[in-house]
Amino acid sequence: GGFGALEFKAILGDECPVIVQTNNLPYDTRLNGPASVYCSGKSPVSVALFPADADKSVLDDIMDISPYDKVYQDVLECDLSLVNPSVHSGPCVINFGAIEQQDLRGKFCMYEHFTFGAAKIDWAIDAERKAVGAAFGYQLTPLEDFCEPKGDLHWQDIYQKMHGAPELTPI
């Protein structure tokens, strides 16, 4: 995700190979020391091919290596479906002070500081992202896919997911 396929194309030009891009990072991790990472879980991912009309048989090989949930129309839809920008932004904005404190550097645990206000910011950011996606003809559901609400997504669903997912709360 994160527009990586488009960046590769910009750099490599016509020599750019077929790229299978994901909408999320496959592992839930936290840096816990120099050259050391704690992995608390595996996240489901969905994929898109670049170029969009590439031979889809490459997806069979990918499924053997790392299973995926669905295939997007193209990498723009995939990129706009990356959940991290709308999950991390709220708590980071609300907690700038704690994040910037030198004695907390590297020790800030986002999920411990995920407040009602952070969830409300994330919900608003997601609404803006969906509006951008709709302008391109996409019906984006990244936070719905992530939070699995019983009905329409509300900020409370985001808050509950961030505090109730065993794979996330340790990081």
Indicate residue ranges for each PLM-predicted region.
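Rossmann-like NAD(P)(H) cofactor-binding subdomain of soluble oxidoreductases
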Residues: 1-32
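A broad structural signal for alpha-helix termini and local helix breaks/kinks
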Residues: 12, 66, 133-136
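Small-residue-rich helix-loop
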Residues: 118, 124-169
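Substrate/ligand-engaging "lid" and interaction regions
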Residues: 10, 26-121, 125
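Residue-identity detector for glutamine
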Residues: 21, 73, 101-102, 139, ...
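A structural signal for well-ordered alpha-helical segments within the folded catalytic domains
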Residues: 3-6, 123, 127
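Short, mixed-charge, low-aromatic patches
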Residues: 13-22, 79-88, 146-152
